[in-house]
Amino acid sequence: MNLHEYQAKQLFARYGLPAPVGYACTTPREAEEAASKIGAGPWVVKCQVHAGGRGKAGGVKVVKSKEEIRAFAEHWLGKRLVTYQTDANGQPVNQILVEAATDIDKELYLGAVVDRSSRRVVFMASTEGGVEIEKVAEETPHLIHKIAIDPLAGPMPYQGRELAFKLGLEGKQVQQFTKIFMGLATIFLERDLALIEINPLVITKQGDLICLDGKLGADGNALFRQPDLREMRDQSQEDPREAQAAQWELNYVALDGNIGCMVNGAGLAMGTMDIVKLHGGEPANFLDVGGGATKERVTEAFKIILSDDNVKAVLVNIFGGIVRCDLIADGIIGAVAEVGVNVPVVVRLEGNNAELGAKKLADSGLNIIAAKSLTDAAQQVVAAVEGK
């Protein structure tokens, strides 16, 4: 679950981290009043969406008058912002962040993620702030400095100082950076985050460090013990199909293709998408129904997949282990009949009672194509989309 920039900065303030004074506004009038609260300009106005690249898309602007603030708010509030990180529809702009402008001397980067290979929270810092860290990692990886947090000892001040020295900081900046590092690490651990990022972390003309931007991603599996973060959730920024899937404990990710995929198991789902691509198809989604492929869950999965108007065929790939394939077939038949599926459905069953399951599909009288293998399933679903 992602948070907005203004929400991230609210958390920063609770932990004593320096950030510009700002207010999130939902109307042009509120935006003008926010500027009055902040004081003399210039100000910075920012569209609040769960996506990067806002500046290049016109969603961030430095303004010198309240008239400009009103014009910016009137232009963007209620509209959708399209950036390189969104789809063609963009993300809805429901709030504008108005904050004091900062005199920037230098831009840095500071962030942390859970590194699965080392099984540690790893902090990354770079002198190349203000640009995508992925681009820095690809083109100049030597400019990214990393520190792993020991899960028993926790973050240590000396680690912050070590990163500060590698960034070329000196004097009071080392102390300020160490405080920010310790604060971010505390937020990360106490709030069950999966990602935290300040890009850019700037050095002002006065030589002070300020958190100019903030990006936080919470671990969805830990939200049950983070009630205040749950209240910050903005579902308008989420794909409604993904939100609906989460209610049924289905793992769904929307893609740009036209072949809906329903699979049990994340690894098998990725393999299924790969083989669809191999045979010239384009997956419309990733959907893992998990181990309990019951009729109810399969029905809901079909509804979610078919809510995408681009879907021209559906591939169901189920490996029956503990769950018998004949029971899964019953669920698929019931779901297709209930939902009223009007696109070709190709089903590949493998494992426990697979032959009986395939026979039930063949005898159902519904528009269900039983595949003999995964390759056969991929070829048949691609052919169905192409009308062959």
Curated annotation (Swiss-Prot):
GO molecular function: ATP binding; magnesium ion binding; succinate-CoA ligase (ADP-forming) activity; succinate-CoA ligase (GDP-forming) activity
SUPFAM superfamilies per UniProt: Glutathione synthetase ATP-binding domain-like, Succinyl-CoA synthetase domains
Cofactor info, note text: Binds 1 Mg(2+) ion per subunit.
This protein's record includes keyword Membrane: no
Disulfide linkage: none
Protein name, as recorded: Succinate--CoA ligase [ADP-forming] subunit beta
Subunit architecture: Heterotetramer of two alpha and two beta subunits.
PANTHER family reported in the protein's UniProt record: SUCCINATE--COA LIGASE [GDP-FORMING] SUBUNIT BETA, MITOCHONDRIAL, SUCCINYL-COA SYNTHETASE BETA CHAIN
Any GO CC annotation of this UniProt entry: succinate-CoA ligase complex
Residue positions binding Mg(2+): 199, 213
Cofactor(s) this protein requires: Mg(2+)
Gene: sucC
Residues that bind ATP: 46, 53-55, 99, 102, 107
Enzyme class, UniProt record, top EC level: ligase
Record bears the keyword Ligase: yes
Species this chain originates from: Klebsiella pneumoniae subsp. pneumoniae (strain ATCC 700721 / MGH 78578)
InterPro entries attached to this UniProt entry: ATP-grasp (IPR011761), ATP-grasp_succ-CoA_synth-type (IPR013650), ATP_grasp_subdomain_1 (IPR013815), Succ-CoA_synthase_bsu_CS (IPR017866), SUCC_ACL_C (IPR005811), Succ_CoA_ligase-like_bsu (IPR005809), Succinyl-CoA_synth-like (IPR016102)
